Structure formats: C-alpha cells, structure tokens
Amino acid sequence: MKTTVIVPVYNRPDSLVLAIRSLIRERNAVDMDILIVDDGSTDRTSEVIQNLADSHPEIRAVRRDNGGVTKARNTGLDNLHDETAFVTFLDSDDTLAADRFATDMPILQAQPDIALTYGNMVATTQIDPLTLRPVQGAAQKEITGIHLSCALMRRSLITRIGRFDETLIQAEDTDYLLRIFETDTRFVQTSTICHYYLRHDGGMTQDFDLGRKYFARAVMKSLQRRKADPTRKLHKPTFDLMLPPELI
C-alpha cells in the first residue's frame, strides 16, 4: 500500500530540492510515492524535477498549465497511484520532519476505523539545507496549524470528501480540512511534528489581506454548509490561529 505525497510547485527549484530530500530521507518508513505537480513553471524548475525523477524511482511528475495551487492539488488527486492507500501533501517551500511517517502511520495501520491523523508543524523563517530543520537561532514556533501537511489521510477519506474548491485561490486547504472535520470523521490528534513551514517574503500567504479574504470565505462556506445541513457539526482539532510577531 503506497503513501502518496502530493507536492505542487511553481518556480521554486531550490526549495523543491530541499522538500524532496526531506521526503526521500523518510522513504524507508512507508512505500512512498512522491507526486510532483509542476504548475506551469517558467524557470528551471521543470529541469530540476526531471533530474530528481531520474535519480529517484519514488518520484513521479506531472506538468499542467499554470492555474494556481488549488488546481495543482486537484491534478495531484487526479493522478493518484492505483496502489495509493494513504495521502498527504507537502508544499514545495516546506520540509518534512524526520520520523513523521514512522510516528503516525502505525496508528492508521493498527486502527482501520481511523480516517486520518493530525499533528503539529513548526513555523520558521529559515531552513538549514543540511539538517532540513530550522536554522539554530531562527524564529520558530510549534503550532497546531490549519495545514494539509499536518494530516495523513486514508484514500477512502479523499474519495468521500472529493476535490478542492477551485473558486478559492487561497485557503483551499482550510476549506478542505473544514469539510473533513464537519463530518463524523474519526481522527487521532497527535503531538507529532509533521513538517517545517517556511515563512518568507516570496510565500503566497505573505499577502495577508488576500489571505484573510479567502480564509473568511472558507469559514463562511463552512457555516453555510452546517446551516443547510444540521447533521454537519465541526469536530476539529484545537487549532492555533495566531503566530508570534517575528513569524508574521
């Protein structure tokens, strides 16, 4: 049973290499299938992807016309391996934490009724390219964030929830997680550090006004769904919604 990690990327050749290295480091923990979705990159990202795929049989790549991260995530879902049983995501500028799969996968393997595990992330301003961890002395904070990389999901859950909402160009992950936690989905909240989330000027979420707009839209959609269907109730982990000033 394969674990597919969907990695959408657009014009991030250098950080993509670090992200993939962090995944390859964990390939002995699961039968890993790394699916890189190139969202129409215009720089050397496509060349880097080809080199990575040539070097690592775990890597598959699909290229699409540029359409934004939401459509790229859906392209990933459309291209799951026939043997995929578990799914998670990793953004191209983040890195997977060591032992992320070794820690949480046994929970899903031992409890077939659990649809996903949900852990923590560390937000930071700088990743060490050697250790693939936050640089010593860099601003960092462990939080339970609203982030897809914190979730390790059964494919059956993905099938039930469906595709990402392509009307959202941001906060599509918030919307997707809310759609999961609005239903009676059995999950285990863990203390596992799942990934290191890089905050930087080039990050899409740096546009706070736009980010707040789409976050509010995702929350409103959740409220509307629950109002229309009283059986939908929010059963969610305890999310941390605020970052310290040095990480904003």
Go through each PLM region and give its residues.
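Cell-envelope/extracellular polymer assembly enzymes that use nucleotide-activated donors
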Residues: 2-4, 33, 175
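Short, acidic, metal-binding catalytic loop of nucleotide-sugar glycosyltransferases
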Residues: 21-31
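A conserved acidic beta->alpha catalytic loop
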Residues: 22, 38-47, 66-67, 91
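Acidic donor-binding/catalytic loop of UDP-sugar-dependent glycosyltransferases
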Residues: 44, 94-107
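Flexible acidic/His/Gly-enriched loops in nucleotide-sugar-dependent glycosyltransferase catalytic domains
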Residues: 56, 69-71, 77-78, 101-157, ...
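Short beta-strand-to-loop acidic/aromatic patch adjacent to the donor-nucleotide binding site
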Residues: 83-95
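Catalytic beta-strand/loop signature of glycosyltransferases that borders the donor
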Residues: 120, 187-194
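Acidic donor-binding loop at a coil-to-helix junction in glycosyltransferase catalytic cores
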Residues: 170-176
